[in-house]
Amino acid sequence: MIKSLKFSHKILLAAALVVIATFSLFTLYNDSLQRASIREDLEDYLHEMGEITASNVQNWLSGRILLIENLAQTLARDHSPETTQALLEQPLLGSTFLFTYLGQTDGTYTARPTSDLPADYDPRRRPWYNAATSAGQTTLTEPYMEPAIHELVLTIASPARQGGQPFGVVGGDLSLQTVVKIINSLDFGGMGYAFLVSGDGKILVHPDKDQVMKSLSDVYPRNTPKIGSGFSEAELHGNTRILSFSPVKGLSGLDWYIGISVDKDKAYAMLTKLRTSAIVAALIAVVAIVLLLGMLIRVLMQPLTDMGRAMQDIAQGEGDLTKRLKVTSNDEFGALAISFNRFVERIHESIREVAGTARQLHDVAQLVVNASNSSMANSDEQSNRTNSVAAAINELGAAAQEIARNAADASHHASDANHQAEDGKQVVEQTIRAMNELSEKISASCANIEALNSRTVNIGQILEVIKGISEQTNLLALNAAIEAARAGEAGRGFAVVADEVRNLAHRAQESAQQIQKMIEELQIGAQEAVSTMTESQRYSLESVEIANRAGERLSSVTGRIAEIDGMNQSVATATEEQTAVVDSLNMDITEINTLNQEGVENLQATLRACGELETQAGRLRQLVDSFKI
């Protein structure tokens, strides 16, 4: 997009960016200065207002404290009931305090105005009494909400002494409405408000009654401000507040602070207005400067504009190379005009030389085209005759290839038959070997079965011995049983053992008889197996003789097939040699034809190039003729 802009527009854009950057930096710098100045003024103002308000509160409370202390000193001289009542009923005390009272060490309590109190009311157990007695001086209690009037109340208590000995405590309940009025009377131009807070963060006086007696952490859960010197910021209902705290000095027993909360956005509203004014002024200045620069650049760029028009006339007009630019100044534009005139002069000379060369090139191109057409005719005749020879050789080669293919097929079939005969011969030989091995294994099996039969005879003899032992054991067990019966009760256990031995001998005799029966069946089966294997051995020997005769016949067939295969291979070899000669001749003819075709194509390409050259030469002449030289 920037590349498509005019040079004058680029200058304007660059100047506008410089001006905008300058004004932006100036605006930011001025904004920073104004912000610092406003913050400094705001801090001074808030500090001053806090100090003044704290002083007003301190003066107001100090006057009330003096009233209580003067009353205590007066009662110290005479605290008779009549004097006490008269002093407590003074109009000044009645208009200043809600209640004024005297609590004595003997438990006597006198108050004005009077109120209903419990019968067991003892002033000596009240916090204000104990605080003043313990401190030995005037004390102030923490503000508390009085249910009867729904107002914050503060108690001032001062010890009363007579002859250096305390005889009671003088107190006064003071409403904080005056303090509320003092604090609420502060006007911050709608930016904020003041409030009274104790040292532990409890809000005592606040324009919003819902915030009274709450802690700062409850009101400002996020970024809870710290009470002390300096300023802090905290979030309240989505707005940033600036807070400062000024201590109320000179009050014994009280740690109070005047807090001031200001809306930060409103406090810096003037800065926003100044920033907006600066931005508007900067925009107006940028527009004015751009307009002035535009008019100035248009005047300064006029020589360059005239030069551009002259160049456009030379480029898009009649191509008059005899025109020259007028030099009207000695600045950069004048030097550019002089250089352009020199350039056009050199182009003029070059175009004049190109015009003569273009005419010569056109004539030479015409001669080359004529020669190429003649060569094309001769090449066509040569190509036709070469194609005829190639066709005849191709037919001869096809016949030779057919013969070679048939001979090769015959040789292939003969080779297959020979291979199959060889395979059959090998199969017969393998069959003979298998028959011989089978016969040998049958003979070995017969021998093994005979050996097994002889061993079963030995087992039968062993069983006869076992049967004899069993019979003898049975007789011995029977004799033992008889002797045990004669022994009576003493031989009963031995009789049981003898009976068990006789049963075991009987079972051993039965098992020996079963084994004898199985051995006899095994001997019969072995004799039958020997007979069957002997007959199988005879049949296998006959099969071996038949297989030997088949192998001899296959050997004879294999020899005949090998002779036929040799003849076919000789024919195929001779035919392949003939085919190779024909192929070589065909390749030579084909190569000649290919070279001829390439020559024709080259001539055609040359002819086309010459035609294109002639066309370009004509175009060059037209272009050169378009210039006025």
Curated annotation (Swiss-Prot):
Gene Ontology CC terms: plasma membrane
Periplasmic compartment ranges equal: 32-276
Alphabetically sorted, this entry's keywords are: Cell inner membrane, Cell membrane, Chemotaxis, Membrane, Methylation, Transducer, Transmembrane, Transmembrane helix
Annotated segments matching region Disordered: 405-424
For L-arginine, which residues are the binding ones? Y109, S115, Y121, R126, P127, W128, E146, D173
Look up keyword Chaperone and say if it applies. Answer: no
Q: Which GO terms describe its biological process?
A: chemotaxis; response to amino acid; signal transduction
Which is an annotated GO molecular function term of this record?
Answer: amino acid binding
**What does the record say about its membrane topology?**
Multi-pass membrane protein
Domain HAMP, by residue range, is 298-352
Q: Which domain of life is it from?
A: Bacteria
For this protein, the parts annotated as crossing the membrane are: 11-31, 277-297
Where is the protein localized? Cell inner membrane
The stretches that face the Cytoplasmic side, renumbered to this chain, are 1-10, 298-629
Question: Could you say which residues bind L-glutamine here?
Answer: S115, Y121, R126, P127, W128, Y144, M145, E146, D173
Q: Which residues form a coiled coil?
A: none
User: Ranges for the Cache domain?
Assistant: 37-260
- One Pfam short name: MCPsignal
Residue ranges of every copy of the Methyl-accepting transducer domain listed in the record: 357-593
| Function text | Chemotactic-signal transducers respond to changes in the concentration of attractants and repellents in the environment, transduce a signal from the outside to the inside of the cell, and facilitate sensory adaptation through the variation of the level of methylation. Responds to L-Arg, L-Gln, L-Ala, L-Glu, L-Lys, L-Met and L-Tyr. Also involved in repellent responses to trichloroethylene (TCE), chloroform and methylthiocyanate.
Q: What is known of its domains?
A: The ligand binding region binds directly to 5 L-amino acids.
* Quaternary state and interactors: Monomer in the absence and presence of ligands.
Q: Recite the other comments.
A: PctA has a broad ligand range and responds to most of the proteinogenic amino acids, whereas PctB and PctC have a much narrower range and show strong ligand preference for L-glutamine and gamma-aminobutyrate, respectively. These receptors are paralogs: pctA gene duplication in the common ancestor of the genus Pseudomonas led to pctC, whereas pctB originated through another, independent pctA duplication.
Write out the similarity annotation. Belongs to the methyl-accepting chemotaxis (MCP) protein family.
What's the protein name? Methyl-accepting chemotaxis protein PctB
Q: Which organism is it from?
A: Pseudomonas aeruginosa (strain ATCC 15692 / DSM 22644 / CIP 104116 / JCM 14847 / LMG 12228 / 1C / PRS 101 / PAO1)
Q: Which gene encodes it?
A: pctB
